[in-house]
Amino acid sequence: MSDPQPTAVDVRESVTSSLRVAVNRQIFRGILFSMGATALAMARLGVPQSMIWSFAKLQARNACRALGVRVTIRGKELAAEGGPYIFTPNHQAHIDIAALLGYLPGNNRFASKKELFDEPVLGAVMRTLGMLPVDRDDPMKSIDVLNRALREGHSIIIFPEGTRSRDGRLLPFKKGAFVAAIEMGYPIVPVIVKGTRRVMPKGGYLSIHPGNVEIVVKPPIATRGLDYQDREWLRDAVREIIAEEFSRPIAA
């Protein structure tokens, strides 16, 4: 039997979807450029970094809305007070960053590999937004950078997988975030991001489809009293919490 031929409705939906993705690509580029340029200009004018971060948060939310990405967050009240915290979300797509920036409560800081800060434009924007360079070859220096931000009252966002998942499955967690949390004595907050892989599939250059994204914040896990020998237990406990929630469908 021959394969069924696409109907006129199928063709129309495919064309409409392709057009929306193309439009979204330009919207995303435009918002990224305008946010970066405005943040740099604000910094040159001496605007406080807290105001620049608030502007970036607003722009991230506006970007999600303009792209047709509907973000909901559950459990944010668990991290609304008592911080600062170390947030450890899973990582499925680049748009995770926009969703977390826009919707996770607080004046937070992303930790990112230091090589990205060497990019002339990207690095300047990241520094302006207060993002934190992490040197995987110098963990003690990285802990010092993170600790300084925490002492200033900023929660930190670290992706424990270290990179985006290629197939949508949760990757093994690296130990760095958990060693840092134990060394510094700040609580870890497991965060689960769902739906972003369908919204922004890996491999498609800035291909963003309208869809639903859910962020789930779990209760903080205290690290005071833990020592270096507990790093693997803490890593595995956090991964288990994230894996259990990640396996559930997005709440209606």
Model-inferred region functions:
Residues 71-75, 95-97, 143-145, 201-203:
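A generic local structural motif
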Residues 60, 128-132, 162-163:
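Short, basic, glycine/proline-bearing loop/turn elements
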Residues 63-64, 126, 149, 181:
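A generic structural signal for well-ordered alpha-helical segments
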Residues 1-19, 140-252:
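Non-catalytic C-terminal accessory region of glycerolipid acyltransferases
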Residues 2-85:
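Membrane-anchoring hydrophobic helices of lipid-metabolizing enzymes
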Residues 33-53, 65-67, 79-138:
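Catalytic core of membrane glycerolipid acyltransferases/transacylases, capturing the structured
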Residues 74, 111-113, 134-136, 160, ...:
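Thr-Gly-centered strand-to-loop micro-motif
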Residues 51, 59, 96-99, 112, ...:
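Hydrophobic alpha-helical segments typical of transmembrane helices
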